[in-house]
């Protein structure tokens, strides 16, 4: 968890994910991301889901949205990206690698604010029942029922799709640490980002899947 500004460590509750609910239906899948503080009216932050289709620790699909402006469903400022060349995660998925040049993260844009193969693919809104959360709805066919790992994230720092995974872009020293007792405290290059561990759907995990929630 790094929902803090760089160097001065100012906490940002609008980036701090408390929990996430995912409900998969025959037509639509719904995700609700709950934050520590009220969802802002506007801002540069992004929220979303990362999907690992083959449970190897590498994200395959990235769903992201800007701050929803209304409790009405909208496709505005919503994107879906895909990693076609499998470089997300670097050499060791879900672990810190030495900074690697040439990684391109999520390089393929599948959906952008209603533009794409299916203009109805993904919708978002502010949660009308909870000011500290947002809702994402996407067609279940985007991923299917074959089983996958998923996690949620919030970002108001690097905001760089081509830099995923962030932990493969910086040394531990340059990234810094959020823990006051650490010799590399405070947070430096890797800031204002929060992610969850990975939950599963559609299969029984062995317990060895990278990033799996305990």
Question: Whereabouts are the PLM-identified features?
Answer:
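Surface-exposed extracytoplasmic segments
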Residues: 1-214
């Amino acid at each position: 968890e790094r929902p803090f500004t760089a160097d001065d460590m100012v906490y940002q509750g609008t980036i701090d994910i408390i929990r996430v609910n995912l409900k998969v239906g025959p037509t639509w899948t719904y995700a609700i991301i709950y934050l520590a503080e009220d969802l802002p009216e506007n801002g540069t932050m992004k929220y979303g889901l990362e999907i690992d289709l083959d449970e190897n620790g590498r994200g395959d699909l990235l769903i992201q949205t800007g701050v929803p402006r209304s409790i009405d469903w909208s496709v505005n400022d919503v994107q879906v990206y895909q990693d076609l060349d499998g470089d997300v995660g670097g050499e060791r998925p879900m672990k810190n690698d030495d900074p690697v040049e040439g990684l391109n993260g999520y390089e393929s844009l599948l959906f952008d604010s209603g533009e794409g193969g299916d203009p109805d693919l993904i919708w978002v809104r502010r949660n009308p029942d909870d000011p500290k959360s947002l809702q994402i709805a996407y067609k279940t066919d985007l991923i299917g029922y074959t089983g996958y790992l998923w996690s949620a994230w919030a970002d108001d720092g690097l905001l760089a799709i081509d830099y995923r995974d962030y932990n493969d872009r910086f040394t531990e020293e340059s990234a810094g640490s959020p823990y006051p007792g650490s010799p590399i405290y405070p947070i430096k290059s890797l800031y204002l980002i929060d992610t969850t561990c990975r939950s599963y759907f559609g299969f029984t995990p062995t317990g060895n899947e990278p990033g799996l929630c305990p």
